Amino acid sequence: MPPSPPRPPKFPGSGRPESPNWGVWVMVLLIVGVLAFGFFTPESFGLGPRKENLESFEAQYKAGRVVLNDPKAPVEVVLSENGSEGVIHALVYRKEIQPKVEMTPFALTYSMSLPDRDKPLLNELSGYRVVESPYRTEEGKNVSLIPEGAQKLSVPEFNRLALEGRIAGGKDGIILAEDGNQNVLVGQIVTRIWPAATGDASVDKQRFERVEVPFTLEFQGDRVKQLLGPDTKFKRESGSWGGILLNLLPIVLILVILFFMFRAQSGGARGAMSFGKSRARLISPDKNKVTFKDVAGISEAKEEVWELVEFLRNPEKFRDLGATIPRGVLMVGAPGTGKTLLARAIAGESNASFYSISGSDFVEMFVGVGASRVRDMFEQAKRTAPSLIFIDEIDAVGRQRGYGMGGGNDEREQTLNALLVEMDGFENNSNVIVIAATNRADILDPALLRPGRFDRQVVVNLPDVRGREQILQVHARKVKMAPGVSFERIARGTSGFSGAQLANLVNEAALLAARKGLKEITEAELEEARDKVSWGRERRSLAINERGRRITAVHEAGHAICLLKTPHSEPLHRVTIVPRGGALGMTMWLPSDDKMHQLRSEMLDQLVVAMGGRCAEQIVFGDVTSGATGDIKSATNLARRMVCEFGMSEKLGLIEYGEHQGEVYIARDLGTRSRNYSESTAELIDSEVRFLVDSAYERAMAILTENRDKLDILTEALMEFETLEGSQVMDILEYGEMKNPPARVTPPPMPSEVEEQPGKDDSGHNEKKEAEETRADGAEERKMEEELEQAERAPFSYNPVDEFGKDGGEKK
């Protein structure tokens, strides 16, 4: 009976579509509600009562615009709980509503002996006229000023009408007459007839509006009582449940918001309340399209990890033989060699749950968080077993314990202890396989590397020439590549490139082709991209005068001739005097294959090639420049390694001198470095290094002196064409001329140099024709200048002080 396949895991997004996060929306709405409640009131939108001061309300009260006798909307005075403040709630007529006015005569008789508080409030009137008698003489008869049918008023009634503004003021409206010990007031009572409430809310809203009049009881209480009458009742705010709930509403909203915030943050893997939760991400095969077909150049590493995939697919094949799958696989290699890509391919090929996490995700500022995340990660992996856990950059958490400035009680060490226990502790987690990647395996803790934890170490090296060719072919599938492109040639010229650098090379070639307007990527774009990735972009805009270009041409010609005349050197690929990166010129060679070993004779020829530029300057100019700084440095380093590391000195023998400069790791190297040889040995080392460099200089001088005519021809060719291929340089050395000279390549214009299409302007001038005439004149002038220059150049003399300072530095 065939074994049943493992249960496929449940990946995110494989089931029903996720429902929207209602908690987040509720939280947002609650926040908006609290802000609206705190910063906005109904009055802000014109929905609540209108606020008025006491003076304005008093004026409306006297004008009769305050509704007084409506039982549905009575005038109320509400005091605060402490009784120091109050608010008048009233209904008033809008300004556009005008009443119908009727006049009724009145008469008031009162004793002059009354106290002032009981006398009429004449000050509330706008004016009155005083006469001596309540009678007037008409046709010889005394006629009373009190009209017939006049309403008799008492003093309180008069005062009330005066406060309500219902006494018609003015000198002609009120007459005050003295009658013995009595005073008589005669005037008109104003009766305003307002439109009554209809009961229709829309109609009444157009007639009335509510107002609130705040006042202080201590200073304005008596005035309010006098205005509204002595029978005015003051009531305090009631502590009803509605008011209490209204006051508690902001607090309740804030608590609800905090609840949803903590719930939302604790629900995610990166929530603020989930410090101890694992940040491992479950990789879905629907989203991960990388397979082993996308991984090239590391065949041995693919075979090592393929066993994991095969075991997960068919475990009985291994169990029948008693074999167990490795508990952990550690992938070690330089940056960019494809360790993470290999892990993604495992995730794409296997049917098991695949968790991915970075080593830095375990370490936080809080104590115990890292260990808690390790335990939670393995708990998740056990629930979906069989499963794979990929830890990228494990050196962030797996450094050797007991070292460093933090001592032995570091938070990172607690995390590492938890990881060690989970991988191979008291409990058996055979269904959880850990895959880790690092480029610093030398600093990992030994307990992490022992069998039972990381049983297998897979070394992912830099690809060889065949591997680089395969990697280029993989990345070329993603772009439009022209037919006939030799990936083998590009692979030979990219020795030491990692997979990531090769991917970047193909992408740069695609960008160059797009910049040139090409439909396909040719080999020329790949080579140009290779040069750009290795040494930088061409700097044709660098301002170099004719003398500086000639110095560079002589220097590079010396390198090229020495490269071709030394038997153990690599084949010449290209010579250029176009500035690129930090160099003013460059001589490039193309290795036939990757060399795992280097002979002493090959190193000696490298020293000769390095000295070729300085020797050419000495031969042609009779002096030297500072342009050979990098050559001298590289030659000195190579010669010192030959003496101190490779044992290629007869006088010093097969002994390594000097401490090996490995990876700097503070937990293993806290002291200062010291030499392991004496001063006399140091002098002998220096003499041997000097001997190797001087011997190479003499060989280079002899080669260039013998080929002086070829040096001049190659220099002139570089001055004319700027860049020469290796075959063209070989033609010059063999035949004295090039059989297939290169075409003059015009570099593409910079974006800032792109001008508008020439044409005719408004004045009728033909700009295109004028531009062509200007270019022709300029070409003729340049030709005349070159002829004069050639006449002055024979014989050529050069003084380095003109171009460089006396100390050899570049002239500013």
Curated annotation (Swiss-Prot):
GO cellular component terms, semicolon-separated: plasma membrane
Extracellular compartment spans: 43-241
Positions in the Cytoplasmic compartment: 1-21, 263-812
One Pfam family cited in the UniProt record for this chain: Peptidase_M41
Sequence segments annotated as region (Disordered): 739-812
Membrane topology recorded in Swiss-Prot or TrEMBL: Multi-pass membrane protein
Co-factor requirement: Zn(2+)
Domain of life of the native organism: Bacteria
Entry annotated with the keyword Protease: yes
Residue positions binding Zn(2+): 555, 559, 631
Cellular location(s): Cell membrane
Family in the record: In the central section; belongs to the AAA ATPase family.
Protein name in the entry: ATP-dependent zinc metalloprotease FtsH
